[in-house]
Amino acid sequence: MYNGQKLYISDVTLRDGMHAIRHQYSIDQAVAIAKALDDAKVDSIEVAHGDGLRGSSFNYGFGAHSDLEWIEAVASVLKHARVATLLLPGIGTLHDLDAAFKAGVRTVRVATHCTEADVSRQHIEHARKLGMDTVGFLMMSHMTSPQILAQQAKLMENYGAECIYVVDSGGALSMQQVADRFKAFKDVLKPETQTGMHAHHNLALGVANSIVAVENGCDRIDASLAGMGAGAGNAPLEVFIATADRMGWNHGTDLFGLMNAADDLVRPLQDRPVRVDRETLALGYAGVYSSFLRHAEAASARYGIAAVDILVELGRRRMVGGQEDMIVDVALDLIKTRQRTTGTSGVAA
């Protein structure tokens, strides 16, 4: 049950939301969104390329600006919220973390695949030495059992992480599965170690799963304005806050300020609607990394293979974050299969 303590509200519009617009926020847009979030009194605002520090690349897509340009601009206008960022070991380095800290970042979420927490040790330990609020971020949490996930969380705690997240990168978890994972966390983590929930809305459960997480002892909730994020988006921040408000939970934010920011600042930027539709539902159904969506749609347009077919096959092969290069391989394999079964040339003109 909810323990009555103030929830920590972590906004991800300027990081996960990057995926929805191919990492193309302008500095002015990022600053306007950050100011609105700060005025609404969220606790932290995550800023980075969608794939974290140093994510701008051929594999993930190039950003309109560097991480440091976005971070410095946002940090310069905040009066309440702290600046957070995301780091994936193997993409971002300790040098990138140092630079982000100097630019104003005070919270870092060190993200690994749900069974690879051991690669986070160096980065978590370094963040603690810098005095940062240090979070372990276990992505694709649906791909392993609650007990194994909890063991991975314990590793991150041992390295120095002060909060560990269940990260539903594929938007594939049910409410019971969320509850089971938080119960497993509470069984092994120290009482003082916080827990967090990062939901995606691919099965339209982003808010529901966040509510269930809080009811099972979760301290921090990730959400984004208008759900701005990969796939069908994250839990929409304004919807979660409205629900929390009706439930009498202490969140400390301005609901109507968030509602205005979602509709006036964020929704107009969506060149592809962030919603549950045929393709994003396929992500949740197949348990596919949500940021694969735009890459799969590009491959679909290029090769004439339905994006849903590509996404379902990616799920069957259990592809994970970092394997974006395999999306084209899957599309080409599906063309070969179609050629064998129909005798057609396969590739669209």
UniProtKB/Swiss-Prot annotation:
The active site is at 19 (proton acceptor). One of its GO terms (molecular function) is 4-hydroxy-2-oxovalerate aldolase activity. Keywords: Aromatic hydrocarbons catabolism, Lyase, Manganese, Metal-binding, Plasmid. Residues 7-259 form the Pyruvate carboxyltransferase domain. Substrate binds at residues 15-16, 169, 198, 289. InterPro entries: 2-IPM_HCS-like, 4OH_2_O-val_aldolase, Aldolase_TIM, DmpG_comm, DRE_TIM_HOA, PYR_CT. It catalyses: (S)-4-hydroxy-2-oxopentanoate = acetaldehyde + pyruvate. Signal peptide: none annotated. Belongs to the 4-hydroxy-2-oxovalerate aldolase family. HAMAP family: HOA. This is 4-hydroxy-2-oxovalerate aldolase.
